[in-house]
Amino acid sequence: MPGFRFLLAATAAFLATSPALPLSADSLNAGNIRLVDPEETVPVIKIPDGIYLRTPNDPDDIIWARVPEFRVEMVMAPPVHPSVGLRYRDEYPEQDLVVQLARTSERFYVRLRWVDPTRDMSTLRDRFRDGAAIEFSESDDSVSYMMGTDAESPVNIWYWHPDGDRVESLAAGSPGSLTRLDRQPVTGASEYRTGHGPDDSQWIVVMSRPLASEGDHQVSFERDTIPVAFALWQGADAQRDGLKLVSLNWIFARMTPDAAPAPGN
């Protein structure tokens, strides 16, 4: 089986110097995780051909140890609807989201991780589920990062929630216009890691989609840079709908691929 042996050798070489992925939430503030400011540009790392995740969206695959992590500050979204204003509280804490962006010749990947002391899996009468999303401008950064500008300047949103470990591809042209798209090409998987204490527990989520886009409002990756933004929902804090944590303005994902670091570098 020479082909299989070649893939094993290529994977081993790619991962030869990979550090172990940290389990502690303290690593969210580690010195090697650079804080990204709004409107900064970050690379989408190219995973070499012949290197594969163990499963299509494996959150714990060692390949992620070769992809740089970036830290994004998340703050409470301003209330954009009276119903959100009624639930809004200034004391909601800010928090960090750690982001990794990667691609192969066929797929685009995003990996997110964040501290969450509680694993909130579903929405019931007085309980709410956790969630995370990445938002893509369908054109450029003139589009509002707060759910799009209008029907002519929309955004594509990948929304993950743990109820069934599902990812949905959505579109919006303004707050309150969120629509589930007919085509659902985005897939994902998650892992909840329990640490030594509540502040050491975290969600890790991977979402991905084929690079080729089919259907209306599915983001095109055939661009040098793509404006992206992020959102989190902490179910234990009764966050849902527009009551959420968001990144401040767009961050630019550079699709002109940077190769993953070679072993020994």
From Swiss-Prot:
Subcellular location: Periplasm
Annotated signal sequence range: 1-25
Tagged with keyword Transmembrane helix: no
Cofactor-binding details, from the entry: Binds 1 heme b (iron(II)-protoporphyrin IX) group per subunit.
Cofactor dependence: heme b
Cellular component, GO annotation: periplasmic space
Keywords, sorted A to Z: Electron transport, Heme, Iron, Metal-binding, Periplasm, Signal, Transport
Chief localization: periplasm
A GO term for molecular function: heme binding
Subunit relationships: Heterotrimer of alpha, beta and gamma subunits.
NCBIfam families found in the cross-reference section: DMSO_red_II_gam (TIGR03477)
Protein name: Dimethylsulfide dehydrogenase subunit gamma
Organism of origin: Rhodovulum sulfidophilum (Rhodobacter sulfidophilus)
